[in-house]
Amino acid sequence: MANASTGKPWEVTSDKVEAAVRKIIEVSRPLKLILFGSYVRGEANLNSDLDILVITPDDIENPRKESVRIRRALRGISMPMDIVVVPRTKWEELKNLPGLIYREAMMKGRVVYES
C-alpha cells in the first residue's frame, strides 16, 4: 500500500480513494464500483495507479465517453487512476473470461459501492 508519510501529491492514498469513489457516485449512475489491482492487493507504490471498474446500467450508450466524463469530474483528485466503464450486460458476459481485467476485478477486487 502507498506510504502516506511521503506526501507525494500524486500518491494513491485512502483519503483520495474515498474521495474518488464519492465523486464517481455523485456524477455517474454506477450499479457497482470495484477497486482492483495493486492498491487492493496492498502492493501499491509511488508508481501505482488506482484501478476502478465502474459497472453501469445498460442504457449508457458509450462507455468510453462515460469514462472520460468521470475522469473530468475527478480532475481535482491528484492521483493516477485507470477507470474502466462497462455496462452490466457486458460485465456479465466478460467477468469470467480468463486474461481480461474484468475477471481480475471480479475475483480479486473489492466492491466499494453497490446500488
Where do the language-model regions lie?
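Short beta-strand->loop micro-motif that forms the acidic, two-metal-ion catalytic signature
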Residues: D51-I55
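Catalytic core of pol beta-like nucleotidyltransferases
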Residues: M1-K32, V40-L46, T56-S115
